[in-house]
Design a protein with these regions (language model features):
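Short catalytic/ligand-binding loop motif for oxyanion handling, primarily in non-cytosolic enzymes
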Residues: 74-77, 95-98, 155-158, 178-183, ...
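Glycine-rich phosphate-binding P-loop
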Residues: 65-80
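PAPS-dependent sulfotransferases, especially Golgi type II membrane carbohydrate sulfotransferases
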Residues: 1-63, 186, 193-195, 201, ...
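Short active-site oxyanion
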Residues: 63, 144-147, 169
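PAPS-dependent sulfation machinery
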Residues: 78-159, 164, 193-231, 319-337
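Conserved phosphate-donor/acceptor-positioning beta-strand/loop module used by diverse small-molecule
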Residues: 150, 161-187, 280
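Short beta-strand segments
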Residues: 67, 147-150, 172-174, 263-266, ...
């Protein structure tokens, strides 16, 4: 599906089709593992022009959907995109790379390795102005007033974004370990491009390398096991590492920025989408949109995953600890420990 558009969405929100196509073709870019990368020069040409646009006040208060991949972030973003005031960007990595090349951690556009964790000091000259210029141009073009920027790894860049924007807000989306790990593993196997060595972990494993080198040493559960983690090769183990460090980091951000970070559990979103979507709207300063809420009830469904992933004993122990912190008491029972 182009721009995550399907028949139901197009039928329910015909006026939103242009906004999604605009974001898809001119803001987001086509990263590694995706088709249509030949269009990227057009995207970058537009971004360079849009970045020079005059900024408006609404560009200072984007809402970021963060967490880890395969946790329901895309479907949440698409439901929020149905809100009359929202422009949804689905991992606009072309825009972020153009503003600061260190953003690219998977190797879609940069030959040089990026930064997984970014702080205020990592802002480069003109970066904030360029992003807000693109946001402003996009909001004016689409007649909306709130950017919803889904980019899971921005979880590791809250300091950076709080320095960049006056009033950013963050959704920390969590999903239980077993389902997330199984879903990530399945995606990797399905989408791997052997010829160019591209998969979930970037070009030639760049994302995995940076995760191990830059994030794991700072994690409270895995920092004493860096060499063990470095030697892991199974997809379920690597997915488990990403889940552990992402969830731990997200919990820290809630404590550090209690007024700026809202935790949403994927399971709660599936169980009562009305309540959770209204929480998000209230948090982001968006008015209630009944059509969006109805679409959420129709669209957000729990995906049952029957594959129970096998992980290294060190990771299994860490998963138990993190699951307890997150309130997922029974999740570890669905994790098989490698002998």
């Amino acid at each position: 599906m182009i721009a995550q558009l399907n028949r139901e969405y197009a039928k329910s929100f015909p006026k939103k089709i242009l906004s999604r196509l605009y974001s898809y073709f001119f803001i987001e870019g086509r990263p590694a593992t995706t088709k249509g990368r030949w269009f990227n020069p057009v995207t970058f040409a537009f971004l360079r022009t849009a970045s020079k646009s005059k900024t408006i006040a609404e560009s200072e208060s984007p809402l970021f959907i963060t967490g880890t991949g395969r946790s329901g972030s895309t479907i949440l973003g698409m439901v929020l995109s149905a809100h009359k005031d929202v422009l949804f960007l689905n991992e606009a990595k072309a825009m972020w790379y153009l503003a600061n090349p260190a953003d690219d951690i998977i190797g879609s556009y940069a030959s040089k390795e990026g930064r997984y964790i970014m702080y205020g000091k990592d802002l480069v000259n003109g970066c904030a102005k360029d992003v807000k210029g693109v946001y402003s141009r996009s909001l004016k073009f689409t007649g909306t007033r709130k950017i919803v920027d889904k980019y899971p790894e921005m979880l590791f860049r809250t300091d950076y974004l709080c320095e960049m924007f006056a009033k950013p807000r963050f959704i920390f989306l969590s999903r239980n370990a077993a389902d997330t790990i199984a879903s990530t593993t399945n995606w990797t196997v399905k989408h791997r491009i052997e010829a160019s060595k591209e998969d979930w972990w970037g070009v030639e494993g760049r994302k995995w390398k940076l995760l191990v080198e830059q994030v794991v040493p700072q994690d409270e559960d895995l920092s004493n096991h860096v060499e063990t983690v470095r030697g892991l090769t199974s997809e379920s183990d690597k997915a488990a590492v990403e889940w552990i460090v992402s969830m731990n980091h997200g919990l820290k951000q809630i404590l550090k920025y209690p007024d700026c970070v809202l935790r949403i559990r994927y399971e709660d979103l599936c169980e009562n989408s009305n309540r959770e979507l209204q929480r998000i709207c209230d948090f982001a300063g968006l008015p209630t949109d009944e059509k969006m809420l109805a679409y959420g009830r129709q669209t957000i469904k729990k995906q049952n995953i029957h594959h129970h992933p096998k992980v290294h004993p060190v990771l299994a122990e860490a998963i138990k600890k993190v699951s307890h912190r997150l309130g997922y008491g029974s999740t570890p029972e669905l994790i098989n420990v490698m002998e």
